[in-house]
Amino acid sequence: MDKCEWFSAVPPPAGMQCKHLDPTRDCIRILGGFLGPDDVVREKLKAEIVTTLPSNFGKTLEMGGQEGLCILRKSLLPRLSFVIRTHHPALTSECCEFFDAELVKCLETFAQTCIDGKKDGIRRLPTRHGGLGFVDVRDVAKHAYEASLESSRVSIATPGDAFLEAQAAVKSQQARTEAFYASLLRQLTADDEDAYNLLVDAATNGCSAWLHRCSDWDRPLTHDEVSAMLR
């Protein structure tokens, strides 16, 4: 009941009024996604994301170290990932820009350094390419939405193996963004063999390995370690 909304301007039945069920007049929300006029949905998303993110990032900074990175990777990034997968990019652009800016400020505080130029590229580069994997959500919003939309068009009535095959045939978000990140990798390593070797090593032995398993660490991540990665 706590996650339900009453889709009517008429008050809910008396037996349901003990719960917080405000009548929904301008748009509806189903499984976390808003449905309604574009301008209304855009404002709903801004109200939910933009007004709450500063507090969430602030708590992340208070925790710091390993715990803060875990929250960024396991909680805040997935939250935006859900939004961009379920809403058209035209509706999420402002939320994405705000989130990306807050993310950079948070990481700069962790690393105690300005993240720009090549450091920002490494920050945005996925861990499979040796980067930190803290991607700009605006870079992937279009691809995430298209992959989710195509997947949703596979009918759940499709029998057994045919359903699995149809889902497997859907081009994934990772596949859709691969060309973009391959281009970013080339930009970061152009005429710089040392940079290329560093990222290849990071993809196999460095940040890629431990960032995916940072929750398994038995000690906090220090500011110096984060700073070293960004440099």
List the predicted regions and their residue ranges.
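Nucleic-acid-interacting cores, centered on viral/eukaryotic replication and modification enzymes
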Residues: M1-R231
